[in-house]
Swiss-Prot record:
The lineage of its organism: Eukaryota, Metazoa, Chordata, Craniata, Vertebrata. The L-X-X-L-L repeats are both required for binding and phosphatidic acid-mediated activation of the nuclear receptor NR5A1. Its main location: cytoplasm. It catalyses: a 1,2-diacyl-sn-glycerol + ATP = a 1,2-diacyl-sn-glycero-3-phosphate + ADP + H(+); a 1-O-alkyl-sn-glycerol + ATP = a 1-O-alkyl-sn-glycero-3-phosphate + ADP + H(+); 1-O-alkyl-2-acyl-sn-glycerol + ATP = 1-O-alkyl-2-acyl-sn-glycero-3-phosphate + ADP + H(+); 1,2-di-(9Z-octadecenoyl)-sn-glycerol + ATP = 1,2-di-(9Z-octadecenoyl)-sn-glycero-3-phosphate + ADP + H(+). A zinc finger (Phorbol-ester/DAG-type) spans 54-102, 115-162, 177-228. This is Diacylglycerol kinase theta. Residues 387-486 form the Ras-associating domain. Residues 1-50, 905-934 are annotated as: Disordered. Belongs to the eukaryotic diacylglycerol kinase family.
Length: 934
């Protein structure tokens, strides 16, 4: 099967090379469109030569240091060539090599539109807007899925050319090409072809594939093979061709489970900023101080007037109407002939009641008169009526020899007549043409909307209505002819926060009572009773959207529900060598580093395989991967987060096709003892996320014991009504250590302080300082713990020395890296290992002793070693397990091994690099994450 173009693709006009922000032109779809014989010429560009698609270059005099956007070299001398529309700057010698299309024609080059997923406004240093090519000196937006950066007021003009990370039933591909994104490379990036520097911190230059990370000059990229193999991380990436999600009614934020916490909300179709606000970046020109200039407010159709969104254009007071019209079109990146439009003046009151009538008449326009002081400052761009138009029609299926065909439509043309006319041009010699329909696709940067047109819909009237709404919107609208398919909609919804321990029928009844689910289209497909969660199969898009939005505002038995949209992994299509990585990130760990890692991993991998633990926990991820035959897990968080994920893995193991996945750790917490033992370090300190993933891929698999602690409290006499109360038994899983006494008391005090003021506990250094302060307060504390507990090891009573704390350790790291057991040889005990099936029991005499252990001056008091322990608490005592403290009532604690052992990944030792060895391109050039949300 021939390779298909990457979804979201844009082609390079005039060549078979890939367009920036997209993969190569498809050998299946072809590069250029096909015009029906007899149709007139189509205006697409005002470029200097065919090598500069869409640009309007003019020679300018340089007054400050300037760099070329093609070669990124300094422009020597006083002359350069600047595009009046998109600000592309070039040497004269580079003009003929420019293949980067102008922003004005970029939407027409998108292969398959894929909307972007913009997060919160952030400050991004030394980054550039892909629309106006200017530096991001003010808060801007960044796509959470690809490396697209854009000013807030440039968002409406950004292309819908994001990565397609799943199949959506429209045009599904099995083979992907490079998905090129222009600029914002690190200054040290090197071209894969010529090995010269291709990145720049001064201008938007160079290209990078969003999937494999290969980087090159825009000219050199044409020499690379078009097919993308996903690079160094190919075995870890969940292939987009193996993920299916019918997401018609859901935004990209919903599909990728990204919380909608944007500082500036951009509603559907509301992709701009309030025109009444000051605009500092983008295509607008600020008010000139010269008396010979004037600044005009330019609106684009009814939509921008309704939202009061305008662009500022500064022109000479002696400018002709044609010049003003060209400036207005440039402000909105409109590349059509200015003669097809007119400017209509708006009343000074701003009321648009005379819209379409007031302002410039045809007679006034023909006079060539210039705007004067009496001319209104607010104008709206209007399209002149047309008796016919050239319309591009795109095929809605693969294996077509052309990308589109162009036909002429007039007042008699309808959707049905257009379908019948273009089918033979696409090679579809079918008798039943009624099976095909015409689909209108609006390709905004944040949402791609598809509308099926009625058979009798007049196409010319439809285009007129679009232009009345927004002239720019015409360039973002396409028409596809596609076969009518009765595809049954199916959406999987994860609903968590339900009461645990119920039956499938009970959960179904509970949801029907809480959200009035429709039994005809909603069914419970999976039940996770222990976690109080279900998976709903919904066969109606409208019902799925209603349930999703309603569940987020619904509480059951006082607990709020969690709702997530989950795709389906087509596990039978996974390549044999594919072992995708399931990533869990706790954004609350490590300050803001967790959120930075979330964004980085979404871009390095498929965002469907990256889960935020504060949004549903680990269960949705394990359910998504339940049919994957082989996968690994990366947990980004502290030891408590690791324990959370391992506990969820234990509970869902029987549902997994891969019941024993190996687990790696990226430590973000305070202690990170398990991360230290497995060589992942004392804590994440800003390493390159790509290097982290490579280390996970190269890590060694090891086994680790896990332990089950049964807490069974004694009967408690109630003093109020003389009723005997019994605390129910509780089971806790342990990975690292369990402390009883003084160390648990310190941990409890720290935990309570963090709950009172969580905002202060965002750095590892501050957290350790609080531990020290709490410890100093307990330095004179004496409890005589050995008199308050009893210990049995392997059913044998063990006499305890005089201690204040008793600690059971599973790994050779305690309290942020201290060796509590010690390294001295002792014939009474075996050398500890994390997979030996034994726990070591150690005592400490107080806070001073603990401090000496932390400083490496002493070790703990070795008491016992075994696999089965019984501890009797004679009074209420502080207890902690893996950093989670509480006060345990008098009773029994039984500690025993959990089967089976868990598979962990230990970071491989770094091998010395040979001199002159080539490093992986992605490792060399991937930029570190940056940009802090406001």
């Amino acid at each position: 099967m021939a390779a298909a173009a990457e979804p979201g693709a844009r082609t390079w006009p005039g060549s078979g090379s890939p367009r920036l922000g997209s993969p190569a032109g498809s050998p299946v779809l072809g590069i250029s469109g096909r015009t029906r014989p007899g149709s007139g010429p189509e205006r697409t560009s005002r470029a200097i030569g065919s090598a500069a698609p869409g640009h309007s270059f003019r020679k300018v005099t340089l007054t400050k240091p300037t760099f070329c956007h093609l070669c990124s070299d300094f422009i020597w001398g006083l002359a350069g060539f600047l595009c009046d529309v998109c600000n592309f700057m070039s040497h004269e010698k580079c003009l003929k090599q420019v293949k980067t299309p102008c922003t004005s024609i970029a939407p027409s080059l998108v292969r398959v539109p894929v909307a972007h997923c913009f997060g919160s406004l952030g400050l991004y240093k030394r980054k550039f807007c892909v629309v106006c090519r200017k530096s991001l000196e003010v808060p801007a937006f960044r796509c959470e899925v690809c490396e697209l950066h854009v000013h807030p007021d440039c968002v409406p003009f950004a292309c819908s050319d994001c990565r397609q990370c799943h199949q959506d039933g429209q045009q599904d591909y099995d083979t992907y090409h490079h998905h090129w994104r222009e600029g914002n490379l690190p200054s040290g990036a090197r071209c894969e072809v010529c090995r010269k520097t291709c990145g720049s911190s001064d201008v938007l230059a160079g290209v990078r594939c969003e999937w494999c990370g290969v980087q090159a000059h825009s000219v050199c990229s044409t020499a690379l093979a078009p097919e993308c193999t996903f690079g160094r991380l190919r075995s870890m990436v969940l292939p987009p061709s193996c993920v299916r999600l019918l997401s018609r009614n859901f935004s990209k934020m919903h599909c990728f489970r990204i919380p909608e916490t944007m500082v500036l909300e951009l509603g559907d179709g509301d992709d701009g900023v309030d025109g009444s606000a000051a605009i500092g970046t983008g295509r607008e020109v600020l008010t000139a101080t010269e008396s010979t200039k004037q600044t005009l407010k330019i609106f684009d159709g009814n939509d921008s007037m309704r939202k009061n969104q305008f662009r500022l254009v500064t022109v000479s007071r002696l400018a002709r109407n044609e010049e003003v019209m060209e400036a207005a079109l440039r402000a909105y990146y409109i590349s059509e002939d200015p003669k097809d439009f007119q400017l209509q003046a708006l009343p000074l009151s701003g009321n648009a009641q005379a819209l379409g009538k007031a302002g410039t008449t045809e007679e006034e326009a023909s006079k060539g008169s210039c705007p004067r002081d009496s001319v209104p400052e607010a104008w709206v761009i209007r399209s002149l009526p047309r008796t016919q138009e050239i319309l591009k029609i795109y095929p809605g299926w693969l294996k077509v020899g052309v990308a589109y065909v162009s036909i002429r439509v007039n007042s008699q043309s309808t959707a049905r007549s257009v379908v019948q006319e273009v089918l033979p041009l696409f090679g579809q010699q079918v008798e039943d043409k009624e099976r095909f329909q015409l689909i209108e696709v609006l390709m905004s940067s944040r949402q791609v909307q598809r509308t099926v047109l009625a058979d009798e819909e007049p196409l010319l009237d439809r285009l007129w209505d679009i232009r009345q709404t927004s002239v720019r919107q015409v360039s973002q609208t396409r028409f596809y002819v596609a076969e009518t398919r009765a595809t049954a909609p199916r959406v999987s919804l994860f609903v968590g926060g339900l009461p645990p321990g119920l039956s499938p029928q009970d959960y179904s009844n509970l949801l029907h009572e809480a959200m009035a689910t429709k039994a005809a289209v909603v069914s419970v497909s999976h039940v996770y009773s222990l976690q109080g969660a279900v998976i709903l199969d919904v066969t109606c898009f409208a019902e799925a959207e209603r349930l999703y939005m309603l569940a987020r505002d619904t509480a059951v038995h006082g607990r709020p529900l969690t709702a997530l949209v989950l795709p389906d992994v087509l596990h039978t299509k996974l390549p044999p060598d594919c072992c995708p990585l399931l990533v869990f990130v706790n954004p609350k760990s490590g300050g803001l580093k967790g959120r930075e890692l979330l964004c980085s991993f979404r871009k390095l991998l498929n965002p469907h395989q990256v889960f935020e633990l504060t949004n549903g926990g680990p269960l949705p991820g394990f359910h998504l991967f339940s049919q994957v035959p082989s996968f690994r897990v990366l947990v980004c968080g502290g030891d408590g987060t690791v324990g959370w994920v391992l506990a969820a893995l234990e509970e869902t193991r029987r549902h997994l096709a891969c019941p024993e996945p190996s687990v790696a750790i990226l430590p973000l917490g305070t202690g990170n003892d398990l991360g230290r033992v497995l060589r992942w370090g004392a804590g994440y300190s800003g390493e390159d996320p790509f290097s982290v993933l490579v280390s996970v891929d190269e890590a060694d698999a090891v086994l680790m014991d896990r332990w089950t602690i049964l807490l069974d409290a004694h009967e408690i006499d109630s003093t109020e009504n003389n009723v005997v109360e019994t605390e129910p038994p509780k089971i806790v899983q342990m990975n690292n250590y369990c402390g009883i006494g003084i160390d648990a008391e310190l941990s409890l005090d720290f935990h309570q302080a963090r709950e009172e003021e969580p905002g202060k506990f965002t750095s590892r250094f501050h957290n350790k300082g609080v531990y020290v302060r709490v410890g100093l307060q307990k330095i004179s504390h004496s409890r005589s713990l050995h008199k308050e507990i009893r210990l049995q090891v392997e059913q044998q009573e063990v006499e305890l020395p005089s201690i204040e704390g008793l600690i059971f350790i599973n790994i050779p790291s305690w309290g942020s890296g201290a060796d509590l057991w010690g390294s001295d040889n002792d014939s009474r005990f075996e050398k500890p290992r994390i997979d030996d099936g034994l726990l070591e029991v150690v005592g400490v005499t107080g806070v001073v002793h603990m401090g000496q252990v932390q400083g490496g001056l002493r070790s703990g008091i070795r008491i016992a070693q075994g696999s089965y322990f019984r501890v009797t608490l004679l009074k209420a005592t502080p207890v902690q397990v893996d950093g989670e403290p509480w006060v345990q009532a008098p009773g029994h604690m039984i500690i025993s091994a959990t089967a089976p052992k868990v598979h962990m990944l230990r970071k491989a030792k770094q091998k010395p690099r040979k001199a002159g060895a080539n490093r992986d391109t992605r490792v060399d050039t991937l930029p570190a994450p940056e940009g802090n949300p406001l």
